[in-house]
Design a protein with these regions (language model features):
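Short, well-structured N-terminal submotif of metal-dependent ribonuclease cores
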Residues: 1-54, 67-76, 134, 151-158
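Conserved glycosyltransferase catalytic-site signature
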Residues: 22, 56, 114-118
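Structured helix-beta-strand junction loops
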Residues: 14-15, 48-49, 85, 125, ...
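Active-site neighborhoods of divalent-metal-dependent phosphate/nucleic-acid chemistry enzymes
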Residues: 2-7, 13, 88-128, 134
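Short acidic, glycine/proline-enriched helix-loop-strand junctions
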Residues: 73-100, 106-108, 113, 136-158
Length: 158
């Protein structure tokens, strides 16, 4: 049986910079019982040489539920991870990413937030985009890794 470490490291092999979509951040920070065991090795092992990229969209999306619930502990944990975690870059959205987002919105009919996330990943030089959104698989400009697909490659699922 393959371990979570084996599955995740195999999936990211060769990647030096990975964009983290919103769900991935939430699953890790909140230690989602299904997905955290697969994600933990990415963030907790020193021998994985990869940097992570986040955008203002990731930050805004992740903070909506804690704000609605007045859960300031969750709010601060999420914000602290996204803004201060080691090997993590918070990339602002510039005009190049905005133009690219428009192209992706038109080409793939993505939601504008998804188009922006993909555009930031590309302009930030990411090799891969880690998400749990199966609809983003159709983007061909970079490697889209869907967490549920990685779970399916585990012997017992996630």
């Amino acid at each position: 049986m393959e371990t979570s470490l084996g599955t995740i490291t195999k999936a990211i092999a060769g990647a030096k910079r990975i964009f983290l979509d919103t769900a991935i951040v939430i699953y890790y920070v909140e230690q989602h019982p299904t997905y955290a065991p697969l994600l933990n090795p990415l963030f907790e092992l020193d021998d994985i040489e990869v940097d992570f990229v986040l955008s203002p969209i990731t930050l805004a999306e992740a903070l909506i539920v804690p704000i609605r619930l007045n859960d300031w502990d969750a709010y601060h944990k999420l914000a602290d991870f996204m803004l201060n975690a080691p090997r993590t870059a918070f990339i602002l959205i510039g005009s190049e990413a905005a133009k690219l987002a428009a192209e992706f919105r038109a080409r793939y009919n993505l939601a504008l937030t998804d188009a922006f996330q993909i555009a930031v990943a590309i302009t930030a030089g990411c090799d891969a985009f880690l998400t749990n959104d199966k609809g983003l698989r159709r983007v061909s400009e970079l490697s889209v890794l869907v967490l549920d697909d990685l779970c399916m490659s585990e012997a017992n699922g996630c």
